Amino acid sequence: MGTPNPDHVSTRLQRIAKLAEEAPGIAFNTLAHHIDLELLLEAHRRTRKDGAVGVDDQTAKEYAANLEGNLLSLLDRLKSGTYFAPPVRRVHIPKGDGSKTRPIGIPTFEDKVLQRAVAMVLEAVYEQDFLDCSFGFRPGRSAHDALALLRDRALRFGAVVLEVDIQKFFDSLDHGHLRAFLDLRVRDGVIRRVIDKWLKAGVLEEGSVSYPGAGTPQGGVISPLLANVYLHEVVDKWFANEVRPRLHGVAELVRYADDCAPRRRRREAGRMAA
């Protein structure tokens, strides 16, 4: 069986990133050819093996028993358009404050691998576009980095920080708007079809399957990237291009997924309030 070559995969993804950086206005019509057995093997290597099982009850160990055969079958179904996105299994986990729960959609293990592969390719494109204010679910960035930036600015300059949480964002994300935003950079038919299948996939909860017309399930590997694509257009670029130029003095946006913290220097914020 073939083994993943992380260095070779990384080099290929870097080529995509370089082209995306050099041509920020182009939309990629051909990206799916980068998803081959080698990249799927690397996607499998990067996928957690100890997560909860999806609707098919297949474990990572069971899938790995015939790994190359399973991945070749997956690749054929992806490229031929016959890949079926199975429903996600919905569970509810407590939020950090313990007062509420958060719905999490658990894909099948194979779906996790394919989502990881597609996310790797798309990430190479979108990491060249995303703004520095975005910290959530991005390589080399974390919630700690976002908090460190807020703390640094507050200590150095003094600031008024407004915390904003977009209510039920992952449940209400508009599919039509997302497709329009994806059109700006990614028009590859194979990749766009499988993303549509994930968006339309059912949700299994308490024995029944529903088909939500909006949102992208938290828990899916691809969901955070799609959320960042959406919020890049409606929040980050809006703040940079529309809000900041209208303000006097310094204002910054720090965003971690659907949690935002616009910041203004204390003196200037007070002047606005007056």
Residue ranges and their predicted role:
Residues 1-57, 61-68, 72:
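Non-catalytic, polymerase-adjacent accessory regions of viral genome-replication enzymes
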Residues 36-39, 51, 67-71, 122, ...:
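Short alpha-helix boundary/capping elements
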Residues 61, 97-99:
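Intrinsically disordered, low-complexity linear regions
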Residues 77-92, 100, 121, 129-274:
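Conserved polymerase palm-domain catalytic core
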Residues 103-108:
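Conserved phosphate-binding loops in nucleotide/dinucleotide-binding enzymes
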Residues 111:
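Short loop/hinge segments at the start of secondary-structure elements
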Residues 115:
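"…together with the soluble PPM/PP2C metallo-phosphatase catalytic core" -> "…together
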Residues 118:
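Nucleotide/phosphate-binding loop and acidic/charged catalytic motifs
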